[in-house]
């Protein structure tokens, strides 16, 4: 789908469709008022008859409006004037895209980016419109033999901005929005792949393909089980021991900083391509969704694509910690004591608390890069879902400034995170009689104790942990990967690169 920006008056638009807003109760937006005046009161007469109230998401499609050059006008409800918030704005864009797609409009000029959204500028409105449009049109049908496509799909969207001086900001918003959307799509596609296709080897092949596509900036190397053994990554290896599929850690290194010696930002993604729970096997119901236990790795892959497409002036390393947790004669057991790469020992009390075992060795491995900071992304705990539901990602960190940066980026991107505490009392829940620590700390505060476990392997750098167990995928009728938190991390890196879109 093609996007562009322009600045012009609505009466001069010659398009398949013009999209304008209507407020409650039956109040025309400034652009709609201009169209109403040109059409000799045609639109306001319809509203007086009660055709459209103006509630958020209501639509009314008008054909061949008098004196209007465009074929159609789509009126869409935007709620109460000057009370339109970020969530409602995205709902309005989503409804607009679905309506245009369903009615066969192949192109449209959208004036919704001129609406007032509290605290948001033109860059934000255009970029969110692009990202929401791409999200709305996303489908995963690669594995279907019969692909159903719209009769006349929407192909072109033009966003109108109030003044010509905002054109540059709008164009930059489209560039950033398309790149972030590309990363989100890549993460969703990876997440939605079935585990018989998407194993650690598949993740490695995708990482290599990304390096091939952006060979100027990205190099990829893959570390297999033999090298992991030599490195002493015994916790990582234990998790994959029950699977026939080899555990593979894919390391993608992007160099975009003009100073090649600048310390890198390291992103680590949990890549459990299927998590049966191991010997502590999961219930059968819903186990199919454990293909999504690699959404942390999918996120990191998607973010690396965004970084490369935008050619950000940063050094970034993305690590996909690929593995599969299966029961079997060679699987690790409850009661085992593992010596991690760091030398610390872990008593295994539950083999279904495996993500932290893969991550702890990966977090030790990345010390060699002398990172500026490290962020891990993982579908780590059901406890985080209980705490924050499916709307907000859990954030924990050993570095306050980094945590504040991530929270700020999450608000900018509309991909929200919430910080949870990590005080000393939680660490005590991990005490073990037989090792330096246990791999679980009991039911209370499970998301926090999991982060406390990881923090014991991150003492040499600034670190943050994103628990995406509640936000990485949806269940039910809308089942599928969400691509979160690609938008959050992309915004964090855009901010770091000084490209945050503030005018």
Swiss-Prot record:
Coiled coil: none annotated. Disulfide bonds: none annotated. Pfam families: Peptidase_M17, Peptidase_M17_N. Binds 2 manganese ions per subunit. The active site is at residues 282, 356. The keyword Hydrolase applies. It is found in: Cytoplasm. Mn(2+) 2 binds at residues 270, 275, 293, 354. InterPro entries: Leucine_aapep/pepB, Macro_dom-like, Peptidase_M17_C, Peptidase_M17_leu_NH2_pept, Peptidase_M17_N. Its EC number is 3.4.11.1, 3.4.11.10. SUPFAM superfamilies: Macro domain-like, Zn-dependent exopeptidases. Mn(2+) 1 binds at residues 275, 352, 354. One of its GO terms (molecular function) is metalloaminopeptidase activity. GO terms for cellular component: cytoplasm. GO terms for biological process: proteolysis. It catalyses: Release of an N-terminal amino acid, Xaa-|-Yaa-, in which Xaa is preferably Leu, but may be other amino acids including Pro although not Arg or Lys, and Yaa may be Pro. Amino acid amides and methyl esters are also readily hydrolyzed, but rates on arylamides are exceedingly low; Release of an N-terminal amino acid, preferentially leucine, but not glutamic or aspartic acids. Its cofactor is Mn(2+). Keywords: Aminopeptidase, Cytoplasm, Hydrolase, Manganese, Metal-binding, Protease. Presumably involved in the processing and regular turnover of intracellular proteins. Catalyzes the removal of unsubstituted N-terminal amino acids from various peptides. NCBIfam families: PRK00913.1-1, PRK00913.1-4. Belongs to the peptidase M17 family. This is Probable cytosol aminopeptidase. The lineage of its organism: Bacteria, Pseudomonadati, Pseudomonadota, Gammaproteobacteria, Enterobacterales.
């Amino acid at each position: 789908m093609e996007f562009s920006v322009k600045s012009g008056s609505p009466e001069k638009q010659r398009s398949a469709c013009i999209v304008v807003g209507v407020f409650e109760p039956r109040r025309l937006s400034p652009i709609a008022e201009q169209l109403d005046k040109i059409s000799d009161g045609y639109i306001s007469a319809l509203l007086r008859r009660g055709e459209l109230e103006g509630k958020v998401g209501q639509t009314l499609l008008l054909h061949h409006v008098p004196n209007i050059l465009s074929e159609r006008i789509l009126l869409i409800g935007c709620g109460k004037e000057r009370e339109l918030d970020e969530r409602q704005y995205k709902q309005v864009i989503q409804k607009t895209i679905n309506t245009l797609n369903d009615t066969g409009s192949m192109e449209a000029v959208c004036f919704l980016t001129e609406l007032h959204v509290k605290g948001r500028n033109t860059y934000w409105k255009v970029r969110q419109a692009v990202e929401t449009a791409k999200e709305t049109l996303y489908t995963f049908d690669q594995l279907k033999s019969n692909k159903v496509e719209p009769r006349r799909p929407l192909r072109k969207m033009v966003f109108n901005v109030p003044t010509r001086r905002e054109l540059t900001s709008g164009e930059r918003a489209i560039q950033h929005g398309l790149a972030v959307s590309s990363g989100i799509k890549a993460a969703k596609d990876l997440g939605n792949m079935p585990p018989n296709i998407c194993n650690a080897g598949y993740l490695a092949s995708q990482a290599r393909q990304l390096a091939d596509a952006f060979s100027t900036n990205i190099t990829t190397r893959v570390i297999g089980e033999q090298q992991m053994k030599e490195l002493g990554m015994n916790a990582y290896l234990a998790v994959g021991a029950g699977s026939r599929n080899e555990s593979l850690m894919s390391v993608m290194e992007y160099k975009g900083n003009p100073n090649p010696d600048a310390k890198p930002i390291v992103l680590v993604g949990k890549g459990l391509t299927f998590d049966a729970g191991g010997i502590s096997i999961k219930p059968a119901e819903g186990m199919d969704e454990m293909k999504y236990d690699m959404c942390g790795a999918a996120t990191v892959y998607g973010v690396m694509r965004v970084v490369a497409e935008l050619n950000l002036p940063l050094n970034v390393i993305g690590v996909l910690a690929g593995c599969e947790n299966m029961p079997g004669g060679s699987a690790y057991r409850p009661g085992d004591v593992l010596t991690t790469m760091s030398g610390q020992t872990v008593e295994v009390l539950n083999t279904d608390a495996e993500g932290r075992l893969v991550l702890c060795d990966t977090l030790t491995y990345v010390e060699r890069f002398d990172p500026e900071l490290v962020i891990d992304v993982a579908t780590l705990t059901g406890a985080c879902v209980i705490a924050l539901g499916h709307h907000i990602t859990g954030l924990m960190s050993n570095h306050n400034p980094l945590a504040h940066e991530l929270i700020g980026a999450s608000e900018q991107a509309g991909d929200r995170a919430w910080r949870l505490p990590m005080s000393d009392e939680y660490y005590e829940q991990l005490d073990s009689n037989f090792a330096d620590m246990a791999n679980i700390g009991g039911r209370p505060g499970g998301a926090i104790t999991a982060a406390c476990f990881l923090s014991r392997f991150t003492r040499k750098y600034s670190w943050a942990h994103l628990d995406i167990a509640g936000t990485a995928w949806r269940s039910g009728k809308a089942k599928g990967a969400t691509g979160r938190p690609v938008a959050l991390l992309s915004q964090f890196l855009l901010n770091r690169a000084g490209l945050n879109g503030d005018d």
